[in-house]
């Protein structure tokens, strides 16, 4: 059984732990490499995944001034990963510079350009936190849409959003805009620090292209069984 809509999060502290998990979940074809693992392992983990013909979501969420994010994206694009992320709150100029840099880096390395997607609002952020802590005076769904539209306007390939915003983004941004949803939780898994979650089938029905799922699979007593259980759930989605 395979399901190319599921991206499993390699949220482990080192290369050895990552390899053990990859070997345990042989059926998984798409893996997310985030800050913790990349800081520890560096490009080596990308080489490991490439050697096993796996797809890669490099989720480093770049967030800096335009020149800096451009340099980071140019370098990351040379690895030939499938997806990479930048915070939409870096601003319009940074998003545009990053997109151009991805094209440049891929051309220099002779690889296919990565799809660059913008993080709209972290799934750990609630509407209350957006208003009270971040002092953003708009409703959370509206803010997520604004960030996605800005990214689309400057040429980015898609956005990361919570499952609760995905239907609105799909309707307004169109079918060609890639939507990636973390914060997805099966009914049998704990929500933990995800504030705006849906089940995998609900998120796909709402319009998500990819689901990022970590602990419900990787922390399960039987990770392969948990993955197959979710993949089976998605086969019922029209």
From Swiss-Prot:
SMART domains: OMPdecase (SM00934)
GO molecular function list: orotidine-5'-phosphate decarboxylase activity
PROSITE patterns on file: OMPDECASE (PS00156)
Coiled-coil features, chain-numbered ranges: none
Role noted for this protein: Catalyzes the decarboxylation of orotidine 5'-monophosphate (OMP) to uridine 5'-monophosphate (UMP).
Pfam families: OMPdecase
Catalytic residues, chain numbering: 61 (proton donor)
Catalytic activity as recorded in UniProt: orotidine 5'-phosphate + H(+) = UMP + CO2
Stored InterPro entries: Aldolase_TIM, OMPdecase, OMPdecase_AS, OMPdecase_bac, OMPdeCOase_dom, RibuloseP-bd_barrel
Segments traversing the membrane: none
Top EC class for this record: lyase
Keyword Lyase: yes
Gene3D superfamilies on file: Aldolase class I (3.20.20.70)
Binding sites annotated in the UniProt record for substrate: 11, 32, 59-68, 123, 185, 194, 214-215
UniProt similarity note: Belongs to the OMP decarboxylase family. Type 1 subfamily.
Entry EC number(s): 4.1.1.23
The name this protein goes by in its record: Orotidine 5'-phosphate decarboxylase
Gene Ontology biological-process annotations: 'de novo' pyrimidine nucleobase biosynthetic process; 'de novo' UMP biosynthetic process
Species annotation: Trichormus variabilis (strain ATCC 29413 / PCC 7937)
Keywords annotated in UniProt: Decarboxylase, Lyase, Pyrimidine biosynthesis
Self-association state and partner proteins as the record states: Homodimer.
GO cellular component, as recorded: cytosol
Biological pathway: Pyrimidine metabolism; UMP biosynthesis via de novo pathway; UMP from orotate: step 2/2
């Amino acid at each position: 059984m395979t399901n190319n809509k599921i991206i499993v999060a390699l949220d482990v502290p080192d290369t050895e732990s990552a390899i053990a998990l990859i070997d345990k979940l042989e059926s998984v074809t798409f893996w997310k490499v985030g800050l913790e693992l990349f800081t520890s392992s560096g490009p080596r983990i990308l080489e490991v995944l490439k050697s096993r013909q796996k797809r890669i979501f490099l989720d480093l969420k770049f967030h800096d001034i335009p020149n800096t994010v451009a340099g980071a994206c140019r370098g990351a694009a040379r690895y030939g990963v499938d997806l990479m992320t930048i915070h939409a709150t870096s601003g319009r100029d940074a998003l545009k510079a990053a997109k151009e840099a991805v094209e440049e880096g891929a051309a220099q390395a002779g690889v296919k350009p990565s799809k660059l997607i913008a993080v709209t609002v972290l799934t750990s952020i609630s509407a209350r936190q957006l208003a009270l802590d971040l002092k953003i005076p708009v409703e959370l769904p509206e803010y997520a849409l604004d960030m996605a539209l800005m990214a689309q306007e400057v040429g980015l390939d898609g956005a990361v959003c919570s499952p609760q915003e995905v239907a609105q983004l799909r309707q307004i941004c169109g079918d060609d805009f890639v939507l990636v949803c973390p914060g997805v939780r099966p009914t049998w898994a704990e929500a933990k620090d995800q504030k705006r979650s849906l089940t995998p089938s609900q998120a796909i029905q709402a319009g998500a292209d990819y689901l990022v799922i970590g602990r419900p699979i990787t922390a399960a007593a039987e990770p392969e069984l948990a993955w197959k259980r979710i993949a089976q759930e998605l086969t019922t989605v029209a």
